[in-house]
A protein has these predicted regions:
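Surface-exposed amphipathic alpha-helices with a cationic face
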Residues: 35-42, 108, 134, 243, ...
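Active-site acidic carboxylates
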Residues: 1-88
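Glycine-rich phosphate/ribose-binding loops and adjacent secondary-structure elements
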Residues: 356-511
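Conserved, mostly hydrophobic/aromatic
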Residues: 133, 262, 342, 409, ...
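Active-site-proximal loop/turn and secondary-structure-junction residues that shape catalytic pockets
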Residues: 94, 121, 147, 256, ...
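Active-site-adjacent betaalpha module
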Residues: 1-4, 39-44, 67-180
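Active-site flanking residues adjacent to catalytic metal/cofactor-binding acidic residues
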Residues: 6-8, 52, 145, 385, ...
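Ordered alpha/beta subdomains of enzyme catalytic regions
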Residues: 180-377, 405, 481-511
Length: 511
C-alpha cells in the first residue's frame, strides 16, 4: 500500500517574506528537507496532499492572529519550490487538516499504509492534524522532525514530544543521501606491503604459506556501537587491489549508511592469504572514518536543518586532514575548510577571513575589503567580526564598507569574553537588519558540539551556519571487529560468536 504525505500550510503566506505570518529563516530551512521527502515518496508511489489555509475575510481565527492566507490571495498558494511534486490541493479553514475538508474521504479511498505529516506550524496545525490522525482515526503516523517548524522552538519541542509520547506518532529524521562521487583513493605501497598491519597477521599469513594452506574463508566486520558508515570506499579500493579477481565475493553497506551495534557492515569471501595481513588496515580505515562521520551526523541532527561545516583540520595530523574532512561531509556537513577534504568530496573548500589578516591590517573592514579585491568572485565574502570591536558594531561597519558585497559574518568570540551566546547572535541580527543588511548571514563557531548547537536552536538564535571543529576531529573512533565465520564453506566461529554467515539484507554485493 502507498503512503499518504500531508503537507500542511507550506504556502506563500508562511514561507515568503513580507506576509503577516512569515515564519522567517526557520521555514526556509525546511524547504530542501521537504523537497527530498516528496522526491522519495513520489518515486515510491505515495500520494501527496497539500492542505492549505483558505480563510474568509471575517474568519474568527483573525481574533487570535492577524489576517492571513485569505482565499483568493497569493498567500494561499503552495510555494514555488514544491511545484514539481504532483499532489492534490485541499483548502482548509481550521487548524486540523481533517476538519471540514475532503482529506478524510481521500484517505478512506486510498487506504494508505501510513501518514507522513510535514509542514507548519508544529504546535498548531501539525499537532492538531496528528492528534486527529492518531487518536480518532487510528492511522500510523510519522512526523519527520526536520520537515516541520514553528515560530517558537520551545513550543516546537513540546509539540514533538507530545505527538510522540502522548499521541503515539513516530518521530523520524530524513535519511541522508550522500551525494559524493566516490573518490579515487590512492592506496600507498606501504599499505599493500602490510606496513600498518599488526605483526601477528603478517606472521599468520607467512605460516599458512609455508604450510601450504590458503582456504577460501569468509570474514565479517561489525562495529561496537551504532554510527554512520564511512571509509568504505577506501577499504573497498584496498580490497580490490589485494583480492584475486577470479575468486572473491564482497558485500558491504554503502558510504553514509547508518549501522547498528554488531551489524555486519562488510563481508569478505576469498582465499585467506590474499587479505589476512590487511585486517588492521581496513578496520582502521572504517573505525576512524566512521567515528568522524558519526560525530558530524550528531551535529547535523542537533542543527535541525541549519547547515554545518567542518572546521577541524587544525586538530589532526596533516596526513589525516583529508580523510577527516571527507568523513565529516559524508556525515552530513555541507563542506569543510581544508583543500584536501574538499578535493576528496568533489567540493570547493569553505573559509572565512582569519584573525591573522585582520590583526596585520589593523582593521576588520580594511582586511575584508582587501579580501574582496584579491579573491575571485566565487569565493564567499564572510568576515570574522570579533577581533577589535563588539560583534554587532563590527558587523554593521564591515557590511557598510562592502556596500552590498558582504555575504556573511562569523562570530567566534573566545571563552575569555564569554563565547558566542544566543543573545549575541540575536543582537547582531537585529543591528544588521536595522541597517538594511537582512541578506548578510550569521556563521557561529568556537567550541561547538551537539549540546551547544541545541542551545542556540532552543534559544531561537538566528544562526545561518554552524562551523564545528574539535567535536568532529577529536571524536573517539568506533571499534570495528573482524571475525571468520566460514572456512571452505563450513560454518565456524570462535567461542562467543555464532558460526556461519550472519544475515543482513542491507548488504549489497560490490565485488
Amino acid at each position: 500500500m502507498p503512503n499518504a504525505v500531508i503537507v500542511a500550510d507550506v504556502i506563500r503566506g508562511f514561507f515568503e517574506q513580507g506576509n503577516p505570518l512569515y515564519l522567517g529563516r526557520a521555514a526556509r530551512r525546511i524547504i530542501p528537507n521537504i523537497q527530498q521527502l516528496l522526491e522519495r515518496e513520489v518515486a515510491s508511489g505515495s500520494k501527496i496532499f497539500y492542505c492549505c489555509d483558505h480563510h474568509a475575510h471575517d474568519d474568527p481565527e483573525f481574533e487570535i492572529f492577524p489576517p492571513h492566507c485569505v482565499a483568493g490571495t497569493s498567500e494561499v498558494e503552495v510555494i514555488p519550490e514544491l511545484a514539481g511534486y504532483p499532489g492534490k490541493v485541499i483548502p482548509k479553514r481550521h487548524y486540523s487538516c481533517f476538519a471540514d475538508t475532503s482529506l478524510d474521504k481521500e484517505l478512506v479511498a486510498l487506504q494508505p499504509e501510513k501518514l507522513i505529516v510535514c509542514g507548519v506550524c508544529t504546535d498548531i496545525c501539525i499537532l492538531h492534524t496528528v492528534s486527529e490522525a492518531c487518536y480518532y482515526r487510528n492511522y500510523e503516523v510519522e512526523v519527520p522532525v526536520d520537515c516541520v517548524t514553528t515560530f517558537d522552538q520551545t513550543r516546537h519541542k513540546f509539540a514533538l514530544e507530545h505527538m510522540e509520547k502522548v499521541l503515539g506518532a513516530k518521530l523520524v529524521s530524513s535519511p541522508f543521501e550522500v551525494k559524493i562521487t566516490p573518490p579515487q583513493f590512492d592506496i600507498p605501497a606501504s599499505f599493500l606491503s602490510g606496513e600498518p598491519a599488526d605483526i601477528y597477521f603478517i606472521r599468520t599469513v607467512e605460516i599458512l604459506r609455508r604450510e601450504g594452506l590458503n582456504p577460501v574463508a569468509t570474514m565479517e566486520v561489525f562495529p561496537s556501537r551504532a554510527g554512520i558508515t564511512c571509509g568504505m570506499h577506501e577499504a573497498l579500493t584496498l580490497l580490490s587491489k589485494i583480492l584475486p579477481e577470479d575468486n572473491r565475493e564482497v558485500w558491504a553497506l554503502s558510504e553514509g549508511e547508518p549501522f547498528q551495534r554488531k551489524e555486519v557492515v562488510l563481508r569478505i569471501t576469498a582465499p585467506y592469504q590474499s587479505y589476512g595481513a590487511h585486517e588492521t588496515t581496513y578496520l582502521g580505515i572504517l573505525s576512524q572514518c566512521s567515528g568522524w562521520a558519526t560525530a558530524a551526523r550528531e551535529c547535523i541532527n542537533a542543527a535541525q536543518g541549519i547547515p554545518v561545516i567542518s572546521f577541524g583540520a587544525r586538530h589532526v595530523h596533516p596526513l589525516a586532514v583529508g580523510r577527516m574532512d571527507y568523513a565529516a561531509i559524508v556525515g552530513g556537513c555541507i563542506g569543510c575548510s581544508s583543500i584536501a577534504g574538499a578535493s576528496l568530496a568533489g567540493l570547493e573548500p569553505i573559509g572565512t577571513i582569519p584573525h591573522a589578516l585582520i590583526i596585520i591590517m589593523g582593521s576588520t573592514a580594511r582586511a575584508t575589503l582587501a579580501f574582496d579585491r584579491h579573491m575571485p568572485p566565487e569565493v564567499s565574502r564572510i568576515a570574522l567580526v570579533d577581533t577589535f570591536k563588539d560583534e554587532p558594531e563590527e558587523s554593521v561597519i564591515v557590511a557598510q564598507a562592502m556596500e552590498g558585497r558582504l555575504q556573511g559574518v562569523r562570530l567566534d568570540t573566545p571563552s575569555e569574553r564569554g563565547r558566542v551566546t544566543a543573545d549575541l547572535v540575536k543582537e547582531t541580527r537585529a543591528w544588521l537588519d536595522l541597517n538594511g543588511f537582512r541578506e548578510v548571514k550569521i556563521f557561529v563557531s568556537g567550541g561547538l558540539d551537539p549540546e551547544r548547537i541545541r542551545y542556540f536552536i532552543e534559544s531561537g538564535a538566528p544562526v545561518d551556519t554552524f562551523a564545528v571543529g574539535s567535536y568532529i576531529s577529536d571524536t573517539k573512533p568506533i571499534d570495528f571487529t573482524a571475525d571468520l565465520h566460514e572456512v571452505e564453506g563450513k560454518p565456524i566461529a570462535k567461542r562467543g560468536r555464532l558460526p556461519g554467515i550472519t544475515p543482513n539484507p542491507r548488504l549489497k554485493r560490490v565485488m
